[in-house]
């Protein structure tokens, strides 16, 4: 069975786009994660606002610590996007071959996206857990990837996997909201258009706006799960009188973090850091798609050039052999 070059091209360009967008937005992501991970009663918070995380790093002279765990996060982003885009492209091709049609309906597309997301979540969960722990560690105290993962059992490396699988529904919610808004808007515009005129289509700007709105709605609806996941994966708080003897990591559960949020912060606590999450998610998605579109053609040309070079090399080798 030959290599699916189109899937490889899509996966590579998506992975590179994810790597660049992750690096650009990483300080914001670190501040967001540390802000989300803290759960304390009113008046005892270390971070009252998202900006407090940034000021803490500046006051401690640990500005570069806003990038702690960047290597692991980039590795995770590259691998996860490669797996996702390859899986998505592969499942899409298999569906087209079985149905005999290149067009894919909305429901089938959502199922394919969910399947690709589930495969990605299972395979990269240890990296996701490690990067979250490294980000939420005290500034200047972040550990390496291997040491972070070996603090607990291998089961601990898959902390939050259930929520990660649940969050694969996020794209389904986004596309459903986008489709409903699009149909409503086009219906209004077509009603105002004169009879006999060509059908109205969405402009690029309106498509971007509807995409941002639908992504924001999906983020709001799934945000309590997002915050619980960050808290489960977050590093344990360091104590000032803590000895240098290594401590076994405290295991966190979904019921445990839900109860902690409810008891200390109330209902609104489930939405703490929502604004930062929406800002980061929308910017990240926009950057990822923009960069991916710009480099897809170049990636495809490079892959074809490499394939052609390997083919010529193999051909020459066969001709020279007796």
Curated annotation (Swiss-Prot):
PROSITE patterns per record: SOLCAR (PS50920)
Location(s) in or outside the cell: Peroxisome membrane
The keyword Membrane is annotated on this UniProt entry: yes
Single annotated GO MF: antiporter activity
Any one Gene Ontology BP term: indolebutyric acid metabolic process
Membrane-topology annotation of the record: Multi-pass membrane protein
Main location: membrane
Domain of life: Eukaryota
SS bond partners: none
Tissue specificity note: Expressed in stamens, pollen grains, seeds, leaves, cotyledons, roots, stems, flowers, hypocotyls and siliques.
Residues in Solcar repeats: 5-94, 104-184, 202-298
Keywords (A to Z) from UniProt: Antiport, Membrane, Peroxisome, Repeat, Transmembrane, Transmembrane helix, Transport
Gene Ontology CC annotation, any one: peroxisomal membrane
SUPFAM superfamilies membership: Mitochondrial carrier
UniProt KW NAD keyword: no
Transmembrane feature ranges: 8-28, 104-124, 158-178, 201-221, 254-274, 286-306
InterPro entries cross-referenced by the UniProt entry: Mitochondrial_sb/sol_carrier, Mt_carrier_dom_sf, Peroxisomal_Ade_carrier
Function per UniProt: Peroxisomal adenine nucleotide transporter catalyzing the counterexchange of ATP with AMP. ATP is needed by reactions that generate acyl-CoA for peroxisomal fatty acid beta-oxidation during postgerminative growth. Required for the beta-oxidation reactions involved in auxin biosynthesis and for the conversion of seed-reserved triacylglycerols into sucrose that is necessary for growth before the onset of photosynthesis.
UniProt xrefs under PANTHER family: PEROXISOMAL ADENINE NUCLEOTIDE CARRIER 1, PEROXISOMAL ADENINE NUCLEOTIDE TRANSPORTER 1
Protein family (similarity comment): Belongs to the mitochondrial carrier (TC 2.A.29) family.
This protein's name: Peroxisomal adenine nucleotide carrier 1
Species per Swiss-Prot/TrEMBL record: Arabidopsis thaliana (Mouse-ear cress)
Gene name, Swiss-Prot/TrEMBL: PNC1
């Amino acid at each position: 069975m030959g290599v699916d070059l189109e899937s490889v091209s899509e996966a590579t360009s998506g992975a590179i786009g994810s790597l660049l967008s992750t690096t650009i937005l990483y300080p914001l992501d670190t501040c967001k994660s540390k802000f989300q991970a803290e759960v304390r009663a009113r008046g005892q918070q270390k971070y009252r606002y998202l900006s407090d995380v940034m000021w803490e790093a500046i006051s401690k002279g640990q500005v570069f610590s806003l990038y702690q765990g960047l290597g692991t996060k980039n590795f995770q982003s590259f691998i996860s996007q490669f797996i996702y885009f390859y899986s998505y492209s592969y499942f899409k091709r298999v569906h087209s071959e079985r149905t005999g049609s290149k067009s894919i309906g909305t429901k089938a597309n959502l199922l394919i996206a969910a399947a690709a997301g589930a495969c990605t979540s299972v395979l990269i969960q240890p990296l996701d857990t490690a990067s979250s722990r490294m980000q939420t560690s005290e500034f200047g105290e972040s550990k390496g990837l291997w040491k972070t993962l070996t603090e607990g059992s291998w089961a601990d490396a898959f902390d939050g996997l259930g929520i990660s699988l649940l969050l694969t529904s996020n794209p389904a919610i986004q596309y459903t909201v986008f489709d409903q808004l699009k149909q409503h808007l086009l219906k209004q515009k077509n009603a105002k258009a004169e009879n006999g005129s060509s059908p109205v289509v969405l402009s690029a700007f309106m498509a971007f706006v509807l995409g941002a709105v639908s992504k924001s709605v999906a983020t709001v609806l799934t945000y309590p799960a997002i915050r619980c996941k960050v808290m489960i994966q977050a590093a344990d708080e360091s104590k000032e009188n803590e000895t240098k003897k290594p401590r076994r990591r405290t295991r966190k559960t979904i019921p445990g973090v839900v109860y902690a949020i409810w008891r200390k912060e109330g209902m609104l606590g489930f939405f703490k850091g929502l604004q930062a999450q929406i800002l980061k998610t929308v910017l990240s998605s926009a950057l990822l798609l923009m960069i991916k579109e710009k480099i897809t053609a170049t990636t495809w040309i490079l892959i074809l050039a490499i394939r052609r070079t390997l083919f010529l090399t193999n051909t020459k080798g066969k001709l020279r052999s007796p």
